[in-house]
């Protein structure tokens, strides 16, 4: 039968969601299941064939002989979780007897890490114990009743430790009253459950034990203050009264070794998973007073009576005990443990035993003080000692390991175990004692307690008997001996290691394991897999003992069986029948083997597969990235190489004979021009002519074939001139006067419109064969001022082209050639004019079309080269310098002579027909670029727009006036200069706005020149 229905309903109402897992299918209460938890806290949990194994938390029942020893490593977070779970279970009425409690706490402990201990060697002979198994059981039964009676009056304190909410406590009280107590179920066990839940989370401030003793000794017990981190309970509860007694009981270790097969918790502590708490000898040996009438064996009766007296004083003086802290209670417990060790030696050995322990008999000669009136009578001392031993033995078996181990783990200032110095000396002085049963079976804790019991037995009696028990207890708090204080820390550690090595048990039994691909593996799946292996080997499933699931693996031990199957046989059979086992179990077996459980470390297969998958994915991504970079680099290289290859082919095709000297010289010139950077310093006004294209753009990036870029160059300083400051200011005043005086500007423009050039005949331009070559009949070349082509080289065998040379100061060498934008029929004539006049700079001041009206024919190739009659034009580069203009470079080749020339075109984009640019600054910047390219050349500059008069005339006027000022002219007459231009080509500067723009541009440039001059 499971728990009653009202209890389950109350549990569902009280428990919050997901705090405790659902209870499994229950069995009748009181049924002793294997592996039950809580045997350290409550008796009656383990069966007759089971022993309580100390797992460092609650204790676990295991079948005898117990083979699986481990300790849980409990973190502060895990302790808090266990405390909450215990509070809720205790508050709802569950005890350790309930299967639901077992299930919940087993689930809570399943995720805690374990440290596996080395079990005692099975072959090592066990010496017979001083107490038989029957006497041990008798002590256990009698001690349980005595301890229950002794501690039942302290139940208010234990209940006060449970800090559960009022609702939980009320529910627990009603539930406990409603149901009858089961066998082995008492309030003491439940109270201890609550007590452990609270005290396991205690923490103490860090500090050395030496500092604690120094602070403790000068004070009396009545002056002690409660620890700050101790649990807070009601002031009316005698908390420290019970705590002192429990701590004294908890520190006790049984004096005699257990019999064979005994696996009580105090004996399992021989192979600790961590260093035990330090127990140091008192600083000064003292003796305890003996009761009257017992001079024969003071160790057997006097110490026991004194311990009993101390316990009674703890009852009578709760006010003094209430000030004790956790660390001080631990000290009292250790002291009483040593006294109890001495009592046991006196009972077991008598005076000879005391002599064997190295005593000189000085205790018998010391004074014997009497106890106060509340001491026990002489004839009842031995019985009281028996009862006292039963109480201590009972409490040691239930609470000793838990309280002391938890306290040790939670003390941050705890020191490693220090081996007493006189132990090695006593062993060497008494070699026969090394073969005794006590040393053969003694653990680390027993060696420690026995050693210090000798020092406690040799203490001097205190001056005050009976009533001064608390003063004696305070003065006898354990302290470091002089030998230990003088010993270096390294030597202490070395001695401690040596002592532990002497008592370490043998390696634990090898275990078989099977690693699967499922992480975590469920316990039922692991058991089913082991059962499949058992059926495969035709052995009973009971041959596989201690089946446990660790992550993705199931571990087991093979016990003795009729078929003599060993763990190695199981491993071999698993490997040979891997496919069959995988088919029956539905699991994939990754690994099998045999090894020590403490050394088994399984790599989760999923993590391994995930790591492998991640590694493969990262490798593929890296390879893809590298491949992408290589492909991109190769593509860029191929594109650039292809472009260069096409350019070389075009350049090589300019010559008819690849082997000719002219072609080789031309190719070498091209390579030099593409590789040479311009000089850093500006060229002088009279330097030699340079034919390198790169030198034309010394203030900008080097052009590359078919490259397009943009840059602004307005920050460039104006060209240096020879104009002095006075002349500049005079010219600037003249310009400003013209611009401000609108009437004067109007009169000058009217005079210019009425001006007629002499001579002004245009008969050649008006011939019938030449009329189609004119874009506008309003702008025809004068007969005396026109460019003559070589008729023998012309495709039309004519010397006419609508272009006029513009002379400046030298009538033999024109500075400009003003011409119209080429027509489709005159493109060859245009390139012939460029070639024959030796021009290297073309200034284009019009877009190709305006509002759908063609302004100029596209007379250059967009890419590659075009052939115009005998002239091949190859586009080398095109640079967009700003929004207003761009620059193109051409290679011009005469196919008749195989000669080549570099021609640069400056194309201004934002100047429309019969209009002006939006800003004079952009045109002045454009002019600087043109002059920088042209500087040092003697050939004319070809300037054209649509008709070759309005915009071309304005540009030529501005450039001519500024060049004169740069050469140091003292007087400037812009109107006269314009009349000079119109004498050579009609219609130059077509509108008044264009004339006014010319004045503004000149004034702005003069102002810039004046700013650049040194003041």
From Swiss-Prot:
Gene: PTPRN2
EC category: hydrolase
Listed result of changing residue 945 to S: Loss of activity
Protein name stated in the entry: Receptor-type tyrosine-protein phosphatase N2
Site (described: Cleavage): 427-428
Residues the entry annotates as binding substrate: 913, 945-951, 990
Role description: Plays a role in vesicle-mediated secretory processes. Required for normal accumulation of secretory vesicles in hippocampus, pituitary and pancreatic islets. Required for the accumulation of normal levels of insulin-containing vesicles and preventing their degradation. Plays a role in insulin secretion in response to glucose stimuli. Required for normal accumulation of the neurotransmitters norepinephrine, dopamine and serotonin in the brain.
Pfam family for this entry, one: Receptor_IA-2
Annotated segments matching region Involved in localization to secretory granules: 1-421
Residues the record marks as active site: 945
Localization of this protein: Cytoplasmic vesicle, Secretory vesicle membrane; Cytoplasmic vesicle, Secretory vesicle, Synaptic vesicle membrane
Associated pathology: Autoantigen in insulin-dependent diabetes mellitus (IDDM).
Reactions catalysed: O-phospho-L-tyrosyl-[protein] + H2O = L-tyrosyl-[protein] + phosphate
Residue ranges annotated for the Tyrosine-protein phosphatase domain, each copy included: 745-1005
N6-acetyllysine modified-residue sites: 970
